[in-house]
Swiss-Prot record:
GO biological process, one term: proteolysis
E.C. number: 3.4.24.-
UniProt name for this protein: Putative membrane protease YugP
Transmembrane annotation, as ranges: 116-138, 140-162, 192-212
Keyword Metal-binding among UniProt keywords: yes
Cytoplasm in keyword set: no
Keywords annotated in UniProt: Cell membrane, Hydrolase, Membrane, Metal-binding, Metalloprotease, Protease, Transmembrane, Transmembrane helix, Zinc
Natural source organism: Bacillus subtilis (strain 168)
PROSITE patterns (alphabetical): ZINC_PROTEASE (PS00142)
UniProt topology in membrane: Multi-pass membrane protein
Length: 225
């Protein structure tokens, strides 16, 4: 019962975090940065400063679809960020470039996350089926196998946390030192990036509590046998 309550609480945190990301992004999308740079210009400048001239910056459709692709080595920014001159645009653009800088120096957590992604992607798809099959058939072996596979997905989300926090830290340091934001604009940057980081924390908690719930089901079933 406790784990169910914790999972519900984590889900609530996840929904709240998503709301905060969208609301803060929209709020500071309306506040133009004093530097007058677009998100694309900000990203390009930071990449060039760090010698990453061969890493392109491309627009991508959607909102909050921004990401760095380590396979193709490209920074993709949603159109509101790519073309925007707001505090939100500069914050998100610099965060994604932070991942490119991590890649440049072979930041351990990023490299590990990239290497295990194919395995985790497979495990995430199969684990729920094993849990369902195990509970319907009363098979502890299937549940146990599901736990092993789901553990990989939880591990992936946990190592995502330092990757995202580090990228945000790099982003704030660079845009302040280079003068992309000034004075009280830093407060807006902190709110945009902190809300985004919270979504990863919430997702990790949801996965962790789900894993613990299935571990308890497995242990209780074993005791009954």
């Amino acid at each position: 019962m406790l784990f169910i309550f914790l999972t519900i609480a984590a889900l609530g945190l996840s929904f709240w975090a998503q709301f905060k990301v969208k609301s803060n992004f929209e709020k500071y999308s309306k506040v133009e940065a004093s530097s007058g740079r677009t998100g694309a210009e900000t990203a390009r400048r930071i990449l060039d400063i760090n010698g990453l001239y061969d890493v392109p910056v491309e627009p991508v459709r959607g909102t909050l679809t921004d990401h760095y692709d380590p396979t193709r080595r490209v920074v993709r920014l949603s159109e509101p960020v790519y073309y925007g001159r707001s505090i939100s645009a500069i914050s998100v653009a610099s965060h994604e470039v932070g991942h490119a800088l991590q890649h440049q120096e072979s930041y351990g957590a990023l490299v590990l996350r990239h290497k295990i992604f194919p395995v985790v992607n497979f495990a995430s798809g199969v684990a729920p089926l094993l849990f369902l099959g195990g509970m319907l058939l009363g098979s502890l072996n299937l549940i146990g196998l599901g736990i092993i596979l789901f553990s990989a997905a939880v591990f992936f989300q946990l190592i995502t946390l330092p990757v995202e926090f580090n990228a945000s830290s790099r982003a704030k340091q660079i845009i302040v030192s280079e003068g992309f934001i000034r004075n009280n604009e830093e407060n807006g940057v902190n709110k945009v990036l902190s809300a985004a980081a919270l979504t990863y924390v919430a997702a990790a908690l949801v996965s962790l509590f789900e894993l613990l719930r299935f571990v308890m089901i497995f242990l209780n079933g074993r005791d009954e046998n």
